[in-house]
Design a protein with these regions (language model features):
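N-terminal, charged low-complexity regulatory/assembly segments
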Residues: 1-129
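A broad, structure-centric signal for solvent-exposed, well-ordered loop/edge residues
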Residues: 18, 22, 71, 163-166, ...
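C-terminal structured interaction module
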Residues: 196-266
Length: 266
């Protein structure tokens, strides 16, 4: 490691710790004490990253109370510094941290809500692709098996607690008071970017399995087979139409049975 890289590493470590004694001898003395200058930089870094987390996890802030959230965020930041320059992608591991953190591990509904909020942030950061139409499906695929490619913003979230209900209750017009008798109730959630907002859909077990297989790039036949394991009455026509109406299909590929290859149709 070069000398400049070593210095950067030492300074970065000092910014995230409370006792940066190893870096102080490396700082030039000026008008202000080096320790004081470093404290200013440390505080600015902590405030900036905490503000980023508050913007990504607004409902989690309300669930924990803002002051306690800032304390938890500080603990997270010191152990999980940003790994890339785009702060919009900071916080990926925050929900998992909450599940392990002593002060929040006993609040699984908070951890699940934070996990949902991160998926929302991911969806909003994803690009929008031109959707295909049902007519393209009918025109290009009169026979044979095929696979569907879906919007890159689409996320599936399986929560042990009703995270979407909690999130919705804290939006404008929501009723957070009705969460007083909150019980553990799993939710299967699909969410995707729609313009500058996010759309949500609650799925049953069969629908979740169907969407999950399609996201993995499996063919429609395999997706239907998996869905029917959960519900023999699975309505393929309704499920397929819903994907197109929601503008989630961006590519249709015919699967060549003999070579197991895919041919792009649209």
């Amino acid at each position: 490691m070069s000398s400049i890289e070593t210095l950067q590493s030492v300074v970065a470590r000092a910014v995230l710790t409370t006792e940066p004694t190893d870096v102080l001898p490396l700082l030039a003395r000026g008008r202000f004490d080096p320790a004081r200058r470093l404290n200013i930089y440390r505080n600015n870094t902590l405030v900036s990253l905490t503000a980023t987390l508050k913007a990504v996890f607004p409902v989690t802030v309300r669930l924990l109370d803002e002051r306690y959230f800032c304390y938890v965020a500080g603990c997270f930041i010191r152990n999980n510094p940003p790994q890339e320059p785009r702060l919009s992608r900071y916080g990926k591991d925050f929900a998992a941290f909450l599940a392990r953190f002593e002060g929040t591990a006993h609040l699984p509904f908070v951890c699940e809500t934070a996990r949902l909020e991160w998926k929302i942030a991911e969806a909003l950061d994803a690009p929008l692709k031109r959707p295909c139409t049902l007519m393209e499906l009918y025109d290009g695929l009169s026979s044979g098996s095929f696979a569907l490619f879906l919007q890159p913003s689409l996320r599936l979230v399986l929560c042990r607690w009703p995270a979407l209900s909690i999130w919705a209750a804290h939006q404008q017009g929501g009723d957070a008071d009705r969460l007083a008798g909150l019980n553990r109730e799993p939710e299967r959630i699909a969410l995707w970017r729609h313009g500058e907002a996010v759309r949500f859909l609650r799925l049953d077990a069969a629908e979740f399995a169907f969407w999950h297989m399609l996201i993995r790039g499996q063919g429609l036949e395999a997706a239907v087979s998996r869905a029917c394991r959960h519900s023999p009455e699975f309505d393929i026509a309704r499920a397929l139409t819903g994907l197109f109406v929601s503008e989630l299909v961006i590519g249709i590929h015919r699967i060549k049975e003999c070579s197991n290859q895919e041919e792009r149709v649209s």
